[in-house]
């Protein structure tokens, strides 16, 4: 008799994806972040569902409903801080996952990579709208500033902004629709993640060497289920240390003041995970130019498969490209720091240099390094 997991229509899908899946024998801990992102999404959907039971998307009561969750709901403080820090954890895993993809050349799987970029945009949109919901000072002013960027679009910009606001300023209609979108988007993300996985399993996983591994595959279970479980345990240990001991470490103190349209905070800035893009936006004096640079800072990832010049897929044996990769990582960290600083010297010029370097490394230096390394192979 055939094993049930190989014949039952539902279990067969799970079996092909998580049990009998042929996996390269040499993939490292950097391949754990896919499953960790799945865990983060589950944590966010579960905690968000319980928060939505007590939250009211109304400008008069939103802030106090969040306070009520923290003070009066059983373990409400825990659910709220799990959701807030879960977003940070999500982006930490997301950026590490993307970094792994760049380092080991995983972008050569076009469909998987492009769906990953769509997932990144969806996650960023979800996180932005979620940040608006507590209706603190930074929620209100962040929503005002970021939605206002759309007014830079020629001809239709102003109408578009008012259409998104549902009025002439960020108000009750805006909060209500942001709550609706923030609720539905994670489920769309979950569906897209399934498609992401579907395309990945069409080609099979990449590996650190960046070479075909068809001759050396092992079943996903028990080898990588065990490995993923270790990653999950370590991630949860780190996560609950954050939630229980340092819940406000990554938050903004301004968001503990209720939203006040008459009082602007001294420094309007988004959450830490958007600061690098915010720094790129601010480094260009022109509004439309800034918005284009902001979008391109993420969209530039879609160009990677088309500007690869090296004969080798992975950076494992490419010292020049490795140096440029770590320079890019350092540059993104500098941009993150600059995004949180006020717009004044010397931060302005540092931000402009870092923004220029970001695009130069990806669009010019890395392809040139690939050509040089190809020549080195012949020496």
From Swiss-Prot:
It holds the Pfam family Cytochrome_B. Signal peptide: none annotated. Heme b b566 binds at residues 97, 196. Its main location: mitochondrion. Binds 2 heme b groups non-covalently. Changing residue 127 to D: In strain: Isolate LVT 2035. A ubiquinone binds at residue 201. GO terms for biological process: mitochondrial electron transport, ubiquinol to cytochrome c. It comes from the Eukaryota. It is found in: Mitochondrion inner membrane. GO terms for molecular function: metal ion binding; ubiquinol-cytochrome-c reductase activity. Its cofactor is heme b. The chain crosses the membrane at residues 33-53, 77-98, 113-133, 178-198, 226-246, 288-308, 320-340, 347-367. Belongs to the cytochrome b family. Heme 1 (or BL or b562) is low-potential and absorbs at about 562 nm, and heme 2 (or BH or b566) is high-potential and absorbs at about 566 nm. Component of the ubiquinol-cytochrome c reductase complex (complex III or cytochrome b-c1 complex) that is part of the mitochondrial respiratory chain. The b-c1 complex mediates electron transfer from ubiquinol to cytochrome c. Contributes to the generation of a proton gradient across the mitochondrial membrane that is then used for ATP synthesis. The cytochrome bc1 complex contains 11 subunits: 3 respiratory subunits (MT-CYB, CYC1 and UQCRFS1), 2 core proteins (UQCRC1 and UQCRC2) and 6 low-molecular weight proteins (UQCRH/QCR6, UQCRB/QCR7, UQCRQ/QCR8, UQCR10/QCR9, UQCR11/QCR10 and a cleavage product of UQCRFS1). This cytochrome bc1 complex then forms a dimer. This is Cytochrome b.
């Amino acid at each position: 008799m055939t094993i049930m997991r190989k014949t039952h229509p539902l279990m067969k899908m799970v079996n092909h994806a998580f049990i009998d899946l042929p996996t390269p024998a040499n993939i490292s801990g950097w391949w754990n972040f896919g499953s960790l992102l799945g865990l983060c999404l589950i944590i966010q959907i579960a905690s968000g569902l319980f928060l939505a039971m007590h939250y009211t998307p109304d400008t008069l009561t939103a802030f106090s409903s969040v306070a009520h969750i923290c003070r009066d709901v059983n373990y409400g403080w825990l659910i709220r801080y799990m959701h807030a820090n879960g977003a940070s954890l999500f982006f930490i895993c997301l950026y590490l996952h993307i970094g792994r993809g760049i380092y080991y050349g995983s972008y050569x799987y076009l469909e998987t990579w492009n769906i990953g970029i769509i997932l990144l945009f969806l996650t960023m949109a979800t996180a932005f709208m979620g940040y608006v919901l507590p209706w603190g000072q930074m929620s209100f002013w962040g929503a005002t500033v970021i939605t206002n960027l759309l007014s830079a679009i020629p001809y239709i910009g102003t109408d578009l902004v008012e259409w998104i606001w549902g009025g002439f300023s960020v108000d009750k209609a805006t909060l209500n629709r942001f709550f609706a979108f923030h609720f539905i988007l994670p489920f769309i993300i979950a569906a897209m993640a399934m498609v992401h996985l579907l395309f990945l399993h069409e080609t099979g996983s990449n590996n650190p060497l960046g070479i075909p591994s068809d001759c050396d595959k092992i079943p996903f279970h028990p080898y990588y289920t065990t490995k993923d479980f270790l990653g999950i345990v370590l991630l949860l240990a780190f996560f609950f240390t954050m939630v229980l001991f340092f819940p406000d470490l990554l938050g903004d103190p301004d968001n503990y003041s209720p939203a006040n349209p008459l009082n602007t905070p001294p420094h309007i800035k988004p959450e830490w995970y958007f600061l690098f893009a915010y720094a790129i936006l601010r480094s260009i004096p022109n509004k439309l130019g800034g918005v284009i640079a902001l979008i391109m800072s993420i969209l530039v990832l879609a160009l990677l498969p088309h500007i690869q010049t090296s004969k080798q897929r992975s950076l494992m044996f490419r010292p020049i490209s490795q140096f440029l990769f770590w320079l890019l990582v350092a540059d993104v960290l500098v941009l993150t720091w600059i995004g949180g600083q006020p717009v004044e010297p010397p931060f302005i010029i540092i931000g402009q240099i870092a923004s220029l370097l970001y695009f130069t490394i990806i669009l010019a230096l890395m392809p040139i390094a690939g050509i040089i390394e190809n020549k080195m192979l012949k020496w």
